[in-house]
Amino acid sequence: MLYSLLYGYFNINLFQYLTFRAGLGFFIAFFLTLFLMPKFILWAKAKKANQPISSFVPSHQNKKDTPTMGGIVFVFATIVASVLCASLSNLYVLLGIIVLVGFSFVGFRDDYTKINQQNNAGMSAKMKFGMLFILSLIVSVLLSLKGLDTFLYAPFLKNPLFEMPTMLAVGFWVLVFLSTSNAVNLTDGLDGLASVPSIFTLLSLSIFVYVAGNAEFSKYLLYPKVIDVGELFVISLALVGSLFGFLWYNCNPASVFMGDSGSLAIGGFIAYNAIVSHNEILLVLMGSIFVIETLSVILQVGSYKTRKKRLFLMAPIHHHFEQKGWAENKVIVRFWIISMLSNLVALLSLKVC
């Protein structure tokens, strides 16, 4: 909107630069989140919109009055910044907004159910999975109709492994959406644990998206060119900015939780960025913390069902370390370090080989 007005009508050349608009979107989303979040916290406390804490985590019972659904605020701030700074005629931008709104809506339904029923279960797994599946399928089909190529790339290799048939590609993309959104959701168990690794992952993916959308950079780095995808860089940095604003209130001890309305939106948007920039496999490295958290749950459940023994004191694995006596801040910061290093290694793939 602002982009179309200032560049399209008034020909202010500064707005033709993607990096300027992305930076502007970052700060708009950041300050808007900073401004709106205290108001949301006051409203949520008045409405007693706090998520019940699981009885299996007694050390967290002091957080039972902390309001949740803060994700609504930073998703809203991201969309406002994107509408102002991005080109809304770009299909990748529109699909990115659909992903944020759609996944956040599913999370909101889950958060609302938890608050309304005053339990930690939320929606039924079948209902939640079904809504996420339908949304993922719609976006994946639209990407296919848009003409996004279906080559599968491996980290540090410049040539694709093979070209997936359309149906296989759509199914694979749906899997990426579902696994990533739920992985971020599982990670959101400690103050700031999900938001900072999400920031690192989004920053890495935003670089890949920028390179993919830039003819000169993609040619120099032998990176697959994706026409028009560079505009997604604006939304990615806007989401990073809003997450920094959210972290202002979510750092330990948290004044607000993002809830599923935030974690599912982040996970869905991370998956979307990975798909359009051909980083579905590299996402395992960039989102290493999310992968570790998810694997810990899968292994814990699998071990208990087959051997009646638990591999960890508690899953997801961040609770295991808490049970071992690690302070919450120690778990959080060490996981941040792992995430940062993983993303630095992932970025090396741009130039290596």
Curated annotation (Swiss-Prot):
Its cofactor is Mg(2+). It catalyses: UDP-N-acetyl-alpha-D-muramoyl-L-alanyl-gamma-D-glutamyl-meso-2,6-diaminopimeloyl-D-alanyl-D-alanine + di-trans,octa-cis-undecaprenyl phosphate = di-trans,octa-cis-undecaprenyl diphospho-N-acetyl-alpha-D-muramoyl-L-alanyl-D-glutamyl-meso-2,6-diaminopimeloyl-D-alanyl-D-alanine + UMP. Pathway: Cell wall biogenesis; peptidoglycan biosynthesis. One of its GO terms (cellular component) is plasma membrane. The chain crosses the membrane at residues 24-44, 66-86, 88-108, 129-149, 160-180, 192-212, 229-249, 256-276, 281-301, 330-350. It is found in: Cell inner membrane. This is Phospho-N-acetylmuramoyl-pentapeptide-transferase. It comes from Helicobacter pylori (strain J99 / ATCC 700824).
